[in-house]
């Protein structure tokens, strides 16, 4: 292991051990805020420390075993050689793992995620495909034991949605879905096509970390214009006879959000505010990343010219253009897209390793 990596890991371990001692101090133990802060910090580095400790134990095993190589007893020498070989192999794998674990983490990876899908170029077919993508993500959420909850939608007359917004709750939901952001292109023969021609349409997908802490995004009430309207269910059927749906306009930014899937106006107001805060937070993240040069190459901006993925129905092929990865479209639309997600994360890790010179 290189000296730079070893020193970094040693420093993290020392920080962890120091924090563990602090947690036992009465002044920390009795201070919930401080105790929570230190515990959270240690939880974020515990996996690194656990694996580095295994590495150190193996190093000591190798050191002790090398002393036994000078023994005259052949069985003892053979045992020592096996221990050295076994420990060296384990440390090779541990080093690979530690190189990834030590990489900078996205501060939002642990959050839930809010996703907005909009039909873009292609009219009716784009809206229908927006509905197909919603079904795909819903199936993915079920497979991965996550919960998908509709927040808002605008039904399209021909089926599907011109816009649909939903929340995905679960372990590291944002981390797993953050690279879905961008333009998704579909190539297929629409049901209304009489001559069998393949049409190309696009939908835009925007992925935002859910903001669940009020203090993270401060909104002045005077900056909000709030309207109510009658909600309708997915597909256009009326589900409410009162104006329970809520639309909020953030006047300084011009952002407009709405929620209509909750049963009461109060709940829809809370959901709409959550979407608004997540949009404002996402804008701040992008601005900060652009200023510091940390904009992720794999995270699409949502610009119409930026096509991140193509869904080719005639050829049963889905291709992610950022990494040149292709797989079965039929399987992917059943929510089985973890192979794509994992390939994107592998590319992200490779980029970070290159940037960190590890």
Curated annotation (Swiss-Prot):
Q: Which domain of life is it from?
A: Bacteria
Cellular compartment(s): Cytoplasm
Per UniProt, the keywords (alphabetical) are: Cytoplasm, Methylation, Protein biosynthesis
According to its UniProt record, how is this protein modified after translation? Methylated by PrmC. Methylation increases the termination efficiency of RF1.
Record bears the keyword Protein biosynthesis: yes
N5-methylglutamine occurs at which residues? Answer: 237
Molecular function in Gene Ontology? translation release factor activity, codon specific
Spell out the GO cellular component terms annotated for this protein, sorted alphabetically and separated by semicolons: cytoplasm
The record's PANTHER family line, in alphabetical order, gives: LD18447P
What this chain does, per the record? Answer: Peptide chain release factor 1 directs the termination of translation in response to the peptide chain termination codons UAG and UAA.
Q: Which family does it belong to?
A: Belongs to the prokaryotic/mitochondrial release factor family.
Extract the HAMAP family matched here.
Rel_fac_1 (MF_00093)
Its protein name is: Peptide chain release factor 1
Organism per entry: Mycoplasma mobile (strain ATCC 43663 / 163K / NCTC 11711)
Q: In the UniProt record, what gene is named as encoding this protein?
A: prfA
């Amino acid at each position: 292991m290189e000296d730079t990596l070893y020193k970094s890991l040693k420093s993290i371990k020392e920080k962890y051990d120091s924090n563990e001692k602090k947690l036992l101090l009465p002044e920390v133990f009795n201070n919930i805020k401080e105790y929570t802060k230190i515990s959270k910090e240690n939880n974020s580095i515990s996996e690194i420390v656990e694996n580095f400790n295994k590495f150190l134990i193996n190093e000591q095993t190798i050191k002790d075993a090398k002393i036994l190589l000078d023994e005259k007893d052949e069985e003892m020498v053979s045992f020592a050689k096996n221990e050295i070989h076994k420990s060296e192999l384990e440390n090779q794998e541990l080093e690979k793992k530690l190189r990834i674990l030590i990489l900078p983490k996205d501060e939002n990876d642990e959050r839930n995620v809010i996703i907005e899908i909009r039909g873009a170029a292609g009219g009716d077919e784009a809206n229908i495909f927006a509905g197909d993508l919603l079904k795909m993500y819903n199936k993915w959420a079920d497979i991965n034991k996550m919960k998908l909850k509709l927040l808002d939608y605008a039904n399209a007359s021909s089926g599907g949605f011109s816009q649909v917004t939903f929340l995905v709750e679960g372990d590291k939901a944002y981390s797993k879905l953050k690279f879905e952001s961008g333009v998704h292109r579909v190539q297929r023969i629409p049901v209304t096509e009489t001559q069998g021609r393949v049409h190309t349409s696009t939908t835009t997908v925007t992925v935002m970390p859910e903001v669940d802490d009020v203090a993270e995004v401060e909104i002045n009430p005077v900056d909000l214009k709030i309207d109510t309207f009658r909600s309708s269910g997915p597909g256009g059927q009326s589900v409410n006879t009162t104006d329970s749906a809520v639309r909020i306009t953030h006047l300084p930014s011009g952002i407009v959000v709405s929620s209509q899937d909750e049963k009461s106006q109060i709940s829809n107001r809370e959901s709409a505010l959550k979407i608004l805060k997540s949009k404002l937070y996402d804008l701040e993240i992008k601005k900060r990343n652009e200023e510091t040069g940390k904009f992720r190459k794999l995270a699409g901006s949502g610009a119409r010219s930026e096509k991140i993925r193509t869904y080719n129905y005639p050829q049963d092929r889905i291709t992610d253009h950022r990494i040149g990865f292709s797989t079965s479209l039929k399987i992917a639309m059943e929510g089985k897209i973890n192979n794509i997600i994992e390939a994107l994360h592998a590319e992200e890790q490779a980029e970070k390793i290159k940037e960190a010179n590890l």
